[in-house]
Each structure stands twice: as C-alpha cells, then as structure tokens.
Amino acid sequence: RVTTRIDMWKHAVTGEDFPVDAPDTVTASGLLKNGAEVGYQVASVPYNASGTCLEIYGRKGTIVLRSNSFNIGPSQVYLAKGNKKMEEVTPASEYILIPNEMAAGPGINVGQAYARFASAGEPGYTDTPDFDHAVVRHKLIEAMERSHNEGKVIHLD
C-alpha cells in the first residue's frame, strides 16, 4: 500500500506550510518461499522521527538493527537468544572492511562500499549484486505497485 498521509509540510527555512502530494508511507506484508512472514513500513515523517529499525524474529532469538539513518549511521545491533535480555553486540571483525583509524561518521559507510567494490574484482568473490539481483528487486517493486493499484495480493515466483 502506498499512501500520502501528510499533505502539508513546513519549509525548513521559512517555517511556512506548503502542500505536498508525494507518497510518504509504504507498507507491505508477505510470505517468503521458506515460510517466513515479512511485514514492513517505510514512512517519511515531518517531526520527531524515531529513526530506522529493522527487527528479525527467529526460532532461536531476535536481532535488531537501529539507526537514526541507515545510510549515514552509526547503527547499533542488538541480539537476544531465546527469552534472554536484548544486548548490544559489536559486528564481527570480518564485516569491518575499513581501517580502524578511519573517522566515525558517514564516511564509514562510503568506505565500506568502496572496499566491497574493490573486492568485487577478486576471483571467487560472490557478494556483489548484479543485473539478475536488480531484476528480482524490480519485480518486487512492480508487484507492490500492482497490488496497490489493483487492491489485491500479487504472488511472485
């Protein structure tokens, strides 16, 4: 479902209200091939946004990723096994691709992206999205648009 919930925004500089008609909320739910249920909501809110949160609930526990902005960071990762208390965890060193001395902030994500890009040319490296990955994503986006426009569930192969 794609909707426009907020039809007036305040100008960041002048403070004046102005009308908007762009969609600001996308919600979706689905069932993956492996049987896992998926539900998500993406919303652009004008005030006091709580940031971004990704929660994954599995048979053995829960993992949560929180950030004011995933694309800028920093992000915090929390893990709870079974019914134990949620605790912040540090990603394993194998996932940190940039030097420790690199300054904190948005540059970290850019550095990580460049490190992955550089590794993409190495023999046997398979962690790089390709055209086939893009086609899958575009089929999903198209199915979401069709579902919204037609008001029905769209099944993907």
Kindly give the residue locations of the regions a language model identified:
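C-terminal hydrophobic helical "lid"/dimerization subdomain
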Residues: 134-146
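Short beta-strand segments
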Residues: 1-2, 39-42
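C-terminal capping/lid region of NAD(P)-dependent oxidoreductase domains
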Residues: 146-157
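C-terminal glycine/acidic-rich active-site capping loop/insertion
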Residues: 2-32, 55, 59-132
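Glycine-rich phosphate/pyrophosphate-binding beta-alpha loops
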Residues: 41-50, 105
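Glycine-rich Rossmann NAD(P)(H)-binding loop
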Residues: 41-45, 57-59, 157
